[in-house]
């Protein structure tokens, strides 16, 4: 929902390409006083497709791009585990969201958690956050599945920012 995704994984900084309007949306929200944090499953680390250093470089590109637009990127929390490792942080489990809540010393009750997959929405529900589906990225496929009650649906991250900023 921030960058183009691939079933073959995004393995290099050169492959990390933002979706149209996503970086501007994050910067607009940030400039308006919103904290934008990211919770992301990164099983490509466990699979050996890329290194932590490469992932951190991708995250730095995200931070730099948002900063160039006058915004600030908040915490980027990621799960490095594979789907069969039994960790507590891989979405749909709430571990990544709990890390974000602890970092900001806040409750996530009612906080908007925006994602493009069912596991994103399930993680939101697990911490009593507001599940928000964007149809960009893998969201169109997700929209066809049964969604958690009260899921809000928007075209993309820009539409979410437009709604929140009124």
Label each PLM-derived region with a short phrase:
Residues 13-17, 50-57, 91-92:
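Alpha-helix N-cap and loop-to-helix initiation/capping positions
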Residues 22, 26-59, 72-85, 124:
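Substrate-recognition element of Asp-dependent hydrolases with the DxDx(T/V) motif
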Residues 88-121:
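Conserved Lys-Pro-Asp/Glu-containing loop-to-beta segment of HAD-superfamily phosphomonoesterases
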Residues 113-152:
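Acidic, Mg2+-coordinating phosphoryl-transfer loop and its flanking beta/alpha structural elements
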Residues 151-159:
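Short acidic-hydrophobic, aromatic-tinged amphipathic segments that line or gate anion-handling sites
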């Amino acid at each position: 929902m921030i960058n183009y995704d691939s079933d073959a994984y995004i393995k290099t900084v050169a492959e990390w390409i933002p979706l149209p309007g996503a970086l501007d949306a994050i910067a607009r929200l940030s400039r308006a006083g919103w904290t934008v944090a990211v919770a992301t499953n990164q099983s490509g680390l466990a699979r050996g497709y890329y290194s932590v250093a490469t992932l951190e470089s991708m995250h730095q590109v995200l931070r730099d791009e948002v900063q160039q637009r006058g915004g600030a990127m908040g915490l980027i929390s990621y799960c490095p585990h594979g789907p069969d490792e039994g960790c507590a942080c891989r979405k749909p489990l709430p571990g990544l969201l709990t890390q974000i809540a602890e970092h900001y010393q806040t409750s996530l009750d009612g906080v908007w958690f925006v994602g493009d997959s069912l596991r994103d929405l399930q993680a939101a529900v697990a911490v009593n956050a507001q599940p928000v589906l964007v149809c960009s990225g893998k969201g169109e496929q997700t929209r066809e599945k049964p969604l958690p009650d009260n899921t809000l649906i928007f075209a993309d991250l820009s539409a979410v920012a437009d709604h929140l900023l009124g």
